[in-house]
UniProtKB/Swiss-Prot annotation:
Protein name: Putative OxPP cycle protein OpcA
Superkingdom in the source lineage: Bacteria
Matching Pfam families: OpcA_G6PD_assem, OpcA_G6PD_C, PG_binding_1
Role description: May be involved in the functional assembly of glucose 6-phosphate dehydrogenase.
InterPro entries named among the record's database cross-references: G6PDH_assembly_OpcA (IPR004555), OpcA_G6PD_C (IPR046802), OpcA_G6PD_N (IPR046801), Peptidoglycan-bd-like (IPR002477), PGBD-like_sf (IPR036365), PGBDSf (IPR036366)
Length: 445
């Protein structure tokens, strides 16, 4: 597990009028420069980031009297317990996960309320996230926190934080945090204002903690004013549709980053290592069958792994068939550069005790119909083992590796990693392009 970096609070969240945000922050730094006490404090000059954090799940659960914790967007034990309770009430499988069926039932229950209750839960959106991002030394964090109240005007808070990496630091590099709260309708009206809060001359990022919505005015304004739109496809209830939207955005020269992509790193590295020995390199070109098992509920990681290996080996999508069933099977065919056919199967495996992220890879197998090809490779998660893939044939002649689970795969931790990367990720974009071509050929059984 990663150790949290302690933060010094220069200014606790302070309510302020929208028109006074810049003046207030300027005064904060002026006061620090003239205080003459303690370590030298200065504002970071790195990047600005907007975080759009709707967090409807916790708000609706709270409105229905099922959740009494903080609104923080982190989906900890209290949130999962409330979701499980709601699922039981709605007659849905009690997983504690925020899936699309649960969201639909919650929205219907909320809309059926005669009066929308005022929430008493402490709203920590913005504050909690600012602590996570502050360790990456941003210059300014702007958190957008829509509320369920249909007519709540926009309110603002400003604060400042300094990460402490050493007990004897002579200087501190600090960041500003601006949190805006209000109804969704009011949020739609301040897109230009939010864009102006992003400091000129520095990289600008937007973490959109929801599905991409190119038709939404706020989304459009932020996408046009930033260098990169960041998402996490593990949130998506229909990642296939959202991946097509991703590709459309990239085609329009919008730089996209998906935090879920980083969760594949160990699987990609072990795949590459399996074919690194000289005697196996030719075998890689003989691969014509790929089976991927993932935790049922979100095929995003499976699709991205498929797109990654297809883009590396020059496979072109030919067909994409959704068969459904217990394992939500998808059968995809590719054609290689030497005109051979490759069959790919994606299987969603029901898991009794799922991990932190919906849709994590469980296992995969690369094989060939050529019995002389040295390419059979099985990768499987340490937590589930390789039994199903080994039962699929050829365990004795396969190279088998276990993938250690990541030490920390929360969205917040991966965001910190993403902030250390500057520039476009060509490997991701090439993989997504293959996925998009395949998805546009999708048919259903």
């Amino acid at each position: 597990m990663t150790t949290a970096t302690p933060l010094l609070s220069l200014q606790k969240p302070t309510p302020i009028a929208l028109a006074e945000i810049e003046e207030s922050l300027s005064q904060l730094w002026a006061n620090q420069q003239h205080s003459g006490a303690g370590a030298l404090v200065s504002r970071a000059a790195t990047f600005s980031i907007v975080v759009y954090e709707p967090e409807e799940f916790q708000q609706i659960l709270a409105a229905l009297g099922l959740y009494h914790g903080h609104l923080d967007g982190l989906h900890g034990p209290m949130t999962r317990a409330a979701i499980a309770q709601a699922q039981t009430q709605f007659g849905l499988p009690s997983t504690g996960r925020p899936d699309s069926a649960t969201f639909k039932a919650l929205r219907q229950a909320y809309q059926a309320l005669k009066h929308s209750p005022s929430l008493t839960n402490q709203d920590l959106r913005g504050a909690v996230l600012s602590n996570v991002i502050a360790t990456q030394n941003p210059c300014r964090i702007v958190s957008l926190c829509p509320t369920l109240e249909g007519d709540r005007p926009i309110s603002a808070e400003v604060s400042a934080y300094c990460p402490i990496t050493s007990a004897k630091q002579a200087s501190l590099i600090c960041c500003e945090a601006v949190t805006l709260r209000g109804s969704q309708a009011e949020m739609e009206a301040i897109g230009t204002f939010v864009s102006e809060l992003l400091l000129p001359g520095l990289p600008r990022y937007v973490w959109w903690k929801a599905t991409p919505n190119p038709e939404q005015l706020l989304f459009q304004q932020l996408a046009n004013s930033c260098n990169c739109m960041i998402f996490d496809s593990s949130y998506f209830s229909d990642p296939e549709a959202e991946f097509l939207r991703f590709q459309d955005l990239i085609d329009q020269e919008t730089y996209i980053a998906d935090l879920n992509w980083h969760r594949l790193a160990a699987w990609q590295e072990l795949t590459a290592a399996a074919f690194d020995p000289p005697e196996r390199r030719d075998g890689l070109l003989e691969v014509d069958q790929l089976v991927i098992d993932y935790e049922k509920g979100n095929p995003a990681q499976a699709l991205m792994y498929m797109g990654w290996i297809a883009s590396r080996l020059g496979w072109q999508p030919v067909s994409y068939r959704c068969e459904g069933g217990e394992y939500d099977l998808r059968q995809i065919e590719f054609r290689t550069e030497d005109d051979r056919m490759v069959k790919v199967e994606l299987a969603g495996i029901p898991v009794g005790d799922p991990g932190l992220v919906l849709g994590d890879l469980i296992a995969l197998r690369l094989t060939s119909e050529n019995p002389d090809a040295d390419c059979c490779t099985i990768l499987c998660s340490e937590t589930t083992g390789c039994m199903r893939m080994e039962a699929g044939g050829g365990a004795q002649s396969c190279r088998t590796e276990q993938v250690a689970p990541p030490s920390n795969e929360t969205s917040e931790s991966l965001l910190a990693m993403q902030m250390q990367r500057w520039g476009r990720d060509a490997l991701y974009e090439e993989s997504l392009a293959v996925i998009a071509v395949a998805l546009r050929q999708r048919t259903h059984a």
